[in-house]
Amino acid sequence: MANRENKPVIIGVTGGSGSGKTTVSRAIFEQLHGHSLLMLQEDSYYNDQSDMPFEERIKTNYDHPNAFDTELLVKQLKDLLDWKTIEKPIYDYTEHTRSSEVEKVEPKEVIILEGILVLNDPALRDLMDIKIFVDTDDDIRIIRRIQRDIEERGRSLQSVIDQYKSTVKPMYHQFIEPTKRYADIIVPEGGENQVAIDLLVTKVRDILRKREK
């Protein structure tokens, strides 16, 4: 990681679907009051598939590294590190492609980048000050995913189970779990692990203090 005096602090938070990434990220956010904060979702950077027929777009494997426009994500993170405003893409899940609209995002002191594959790409990892892997038992993750997809996304139980078996589980073991070796901190039990969250917040505050000198 290069020396980045007076630059934003970038925290990468990853783990499998339903691991508690968002809970951990929000817990860090809540404890870092007094600093400007930004949460970026890797999901916003799914590829633009507008040139593909809809029948092909619906077959997208969203758990594969090739589903993401990592080059754009790296570029926009570098812009944020230079205190530049970015135009973050917005993904349209109903159309399975990027929306024509964008969201203007201002740089902040602390940037949390959350997603299933944020530790997969070396160029992305190199921009991070702290890399976190949220490690949660497979059974707990699938239960959480079923609850979320049925309650929040209107999915059927069978469709969630089929997707889990065909893509989510194999992609986790092939691409996501191996990135654990790049993590500075592995957080078991997700957002329930208050000790790990307290340690993370202390470390972030320490980095911020050093950059303010």
Curated annotation (Swiss-Prot):
**Could you tell me the keywords of this UniProt record?**
ATP-binding, Cytoplasm, Kinase, Nucleotide-binding, Transferase
Q: Does the keyword 4Fe-4S apply?
A: no
Spell out the reaction equation it catalyses: uridine + ATP = UMP + ADP + H(+); cytidine + ATP = CMP + ADP + H(+)
Identify one Gene Ontology CC term for this UniProt entry: cytoplasm
Query: By its UniProt entry, which HAMAP family does this protein fall under?
Result: Uridine_kinase
Listed NCBIfam families: PRK05480.1, udk
One example of a Gene Ontology biological process annotation: CTP salvage
The protein in question is named Uridine kinase
Looking up CDD domains in the UniProt record yields: UMPK
List the subcellular locations.
Answer: Cytoplasm
Q: Which residues bind ATP?
A: G15, G16, S17, G18, S19, G20, K21, T22
Entry EC number(s): 2.7.1.48
Write the gene name. udk
Q: Pathway it belongs to?
A: Pyrimidine metabolism; CTP biosynthesis via salvage pathway; CTP from cytidine: step 1/3; Pyrimidine metabolism; UMP biosynthesis via salvage pathway; UMP from uridine: step 1/1
GO molecular function of the protein, one example? Answer: uridine kinase activity
| Homology family | Belongs to the uridine kinase family.
What species is given as this protein's source? Answer: Ligilactobacillus salivarius (strain UCC118)
In terms of Gene3D superfamilies, this protein maps to: P-loop containing nucleotide triphosphate hydrolases
Which is one Pfam family of this protein?
PRK
Principal EC category? transferase
